[in-house]
């Protein structure tokens, strides 16, 4: 899976990726400012998660657009302490809606370790974040809730595909199961091929086009059966306007 880590300038994107990868990330920067991208790889419940961090300066819009291509989810960082950064945050939020319409987003209200950090409810109001978007209070510097924020995003992303995956489970490992899936979904071969290729690229399935068999990967089977397993020991409260 590809996750875009974005947000305003100095919101903590590079530090977030370093924290999630335990320091095993790559950054292209100049004088402590990301000028191209950050990259890291993590495994959560056997799902391989590719993290791509974007530069935050406004004039890097084209690069953010390139990096966003093919993203399955967006971890959007907000500087909880610096209200002046909200103007840039709103601009980049608009870019996300433009580049990745309909793609799941989770907000990390970052820098919660600093004095005068805003509460989640204040950030939601200041940035006009929709009530169906989770906001997780984090500190990339201390590691507070960084894994939780990513896991919440993964849960939202997987749940988006859950109905389809449950239908696919019926024909998992079945000879000519792809034909059965076509019938169930009312889709032509071209559309099915495109969708299965998309799922295979993300590590959800393995496909043998000679026999028209597909197999859901063990990791995704586990998630289908227990989707909230992704959240591990974390709790997510559905009430209180989706604040975490």
Regions found by a protein language model. Give the residues of each.
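Conserved G1/Walker A P-loop phosphate-binding module
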Residues: 1-50
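Switch II (G3) loop of P-loop NTPases
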Residues: 46-61
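Inter-motif core of Ras-like GTPase G domains
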Residues: 60-82, 95, 99
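Conserved C-terminal guanine-recognition region of P-loop GTPase G domains, centered on the G4
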Residues: 80-131
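Canonical P-loop GTPase G-domain recognition
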Residues: 113-163
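Short amphipathic alpha-helical interface segments
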Residues: 157-179, 183, 244
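Short amphipathic alpha-helical interaction segments
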Residues: 179, 185-201
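Short, amphipathic alpha-helical interaction segments positioned at domain boundaries
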Residues: 218-244
């Amino acid at each position: 899976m590809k996750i875009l880590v974005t947000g305003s300038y100095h919101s903590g994107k590079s530090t977030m990726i370093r924290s999630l990868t335990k320091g095993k990330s790559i950054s292209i920067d100049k004088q402590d400012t990301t000028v191209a991208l950050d990259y890291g790889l993590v495994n959560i419940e056997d799902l391989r998660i590719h993290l791509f961090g974007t530069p935050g300066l406004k004039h890097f819009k084209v690069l953010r657009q390139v990096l966003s291509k093919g993203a399955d989810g967006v971890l959007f960082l907000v500087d909880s302490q610096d209200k002046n950064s909200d103007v840039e945050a709103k601009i980049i939020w608009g870019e996300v809606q433009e580049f990745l319409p309909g793609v799941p987003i989770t907000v990390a209200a970052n820098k919660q370790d600093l004095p005068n950090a805003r509460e989640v409810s204040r950030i939601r109001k200041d940035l006009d974040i929709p009530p169906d978007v989770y906001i997780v209070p984090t500190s990339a510097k201390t590691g507070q809730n960084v894994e939780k924020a990513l896991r919440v995003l993964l849960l939202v992303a997987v749940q988006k595909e859950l109905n389809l995956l449950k239908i696919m489970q019926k024909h998992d490992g079945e000879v000519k199961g792809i034909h059965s899936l076509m019938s169930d979904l009312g889709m032509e071969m071209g559309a099915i091929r495109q969708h299965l290729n998309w799922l295979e690229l993300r590590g959800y399935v393995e496909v043998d086009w000679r026999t028209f068999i597909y197999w859901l990967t063990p990791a995704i089977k586990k998630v289908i059966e227990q989707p909230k397993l992704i959240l591990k020991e974390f709790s997510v409260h559905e009430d209180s306007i989706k604040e975490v």
